[in-house]
Curated annotation (Swiss-Prot):
Biological processes per GO annotation: negative regulation of gibberellic acid mediated signaling pathway
Primary localization class, coarse: nucleus
UniProt name for this protein: AT-hook motif nuclear-localized protein 25
Superkingdom of origin organism: Eukaryota
Amino acid sequence: MSSYMHPLLGQELHLQRPEDSRTPPDQNNMELNRSEADEAKAETTPTGGATSSATASGSSSGRRPRGRPAGSKNKPKPPTIITRDSPNVLRSHVLEVTSGSDISEAVSTYATRRGCGVCIISGTGAVTNVTIRQPAAPAGGGVITLHGRFDILSLTGTALPPPAPPGAGGLTVYLAGGQGQVVGGNVAGSLIASGPVVLMAASFANAVYDRLPIEEEETPPPRTTGVQQQQPEASQSSEVTGSGAQACESNLQGGNGGGGVAFYNLGMNMNNFQFSGGDIYGMSGGSGGGGGGATRPAF
């Protein structure tokens, strides 16, 4: 048996030897292929890196960033600064009339000294010794004097400084008596404050008088390209407020006979504002061609 197994083992060992002998060439081939692949990769690596970097830079430069830029949401806005006031602006005032003073006289004096028109919007307080004119009374209205203390329900009116006529302004008051009676009318005399009286008022520097209705003209007036615009003669526009201590007395029409235009300055430069010409009550310049002989329109 041993003699029979020995040749078989010898054949198996002999058959395994060629396999062992063929293994090293395969390993050599694999190593050779690896070395060639490494060399090829080493040769192509610089070019490939440059291409990838160029592609990355191009994509980053061409891509638009998402979202708003940093700090753009809360940027401070520049403040709005008004460096010059308009001559037609209204200024609000709270006027307090002391006890024992005549409200009508106090408002008129305030308008004259300040050189502006005053519009009384409302009033609160109590008055005594009221002289009013009631239009509903017989014979075209009568003047009555009320003695006693009355509470102000409503007080409105205007006060214009000279040279405006007295009929252009005035006060209207409605009062409540102690027994619940209500009386009112145009203030025709004294209106004495019985305690502090607070008035809400608005002042204006310029007021233009227009007579209505405006008659239609056959040909429309020519349009001007500048700031100054002439009004049609049918409207008979005139300045109600004239020149006072603080008035701008310069003739904005250039002395061409169009009539002087004067208004109260109120401490602001209004030489750059131009208004239409017209007859100013009592202030028409005699040097103009037709300003001196114009008649004052009736209220």
